[in-house]
């Protein structure tokens, strides 16, 4: 099974530029075209949050149009720039998002299970997995202990050394680690948020962040370094 991960496309309404500089729609369209040229094609694509920049319905409509040429199913999860209800409405027809509550789900149609988490705190840059979300995860993993899992979430559950990003990280990574450690079938944790690639060990598995299709964050380890 081949899974391709995209992250943090930060799509805006048609014609708008991110920070008045970055044509995020053009960058995502280019990525989609490159994915469709891969041989063999991935079985699925996943996008690990910050799908759009302001959580507006027009942005999600634009995102759907940009993703429509993909030659494989695509599954999306929220990041801190997203808004649950507009996202839910935009992708409701695809049938995998829950009708209410947190945007957490499992995809059971492939040799590897996809398990998606919602780390969003509305109005905040950082993320959290509350007891309700972690209980859901524990149950989802316990329900199929023999099947390998790719876990997807926006905020990485580890410090990166980029202080300004770490201040907007996942608040309770220790609680997540306790759940993951109980379920050795978790093969990897796919994350976004950081706008660059970092991999590390976490709770007996490997967690990693994907670069953004929109723009990258400088690897500057000085405490007051700009993004």
Language-model regions, residue ranges each:
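Solvent-exposed loop/turn segments at secondary-structure junctions
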Residues: 51-53, 80-84, 121, 157, ...
């Amino acid at each position: 099974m081949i899974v391709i991960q995209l992250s943090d496309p930060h799509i805006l309404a048609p014609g708008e530029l991110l920070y008045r500089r970055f044509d995020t729609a053009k960058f995502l369209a280019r990525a989609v075209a490159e994915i469709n040229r891969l041989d063999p094609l991935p079985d699925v694509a996943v996008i690990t949050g910050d799908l759009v920049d302001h959580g507006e319905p027009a942005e999600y409509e634009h995102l759907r149009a940009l993703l429509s040429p993909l030659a494989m199913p695509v599954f999306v999860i929220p990041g801190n720039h997203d808004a649950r209800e507009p996202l839910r409405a935009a992708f409701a027809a695809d049938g995998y998002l829950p009708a209410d509550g947190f945007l957490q789900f499992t995809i059971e149609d492939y040799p590897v299970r996809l398990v998606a988490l919602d780390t969003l705190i509305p109005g905040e840059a950082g993320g959290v997995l509350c007891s309700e979300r972690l209980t859901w995860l524990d149950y989802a993993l316990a329900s199929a202990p023999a099947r390998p899992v790719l876990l997807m979430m926006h905020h990485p559950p580890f410090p990166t050394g980029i202080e300004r990003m770490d201040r907007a990280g996942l608040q309770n990574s220790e609680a997540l680690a306790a759940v993951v450690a109980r379920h050795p079938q978790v093969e990897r944790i796919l994350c976004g948020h950081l706008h660059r690639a970092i991999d590390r060990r976490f709770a007996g598995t490997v967690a990693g962040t994907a670069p953004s299709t929109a723009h990258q964050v400088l690897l500057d380890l000085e405490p007051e370094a700009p993004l």
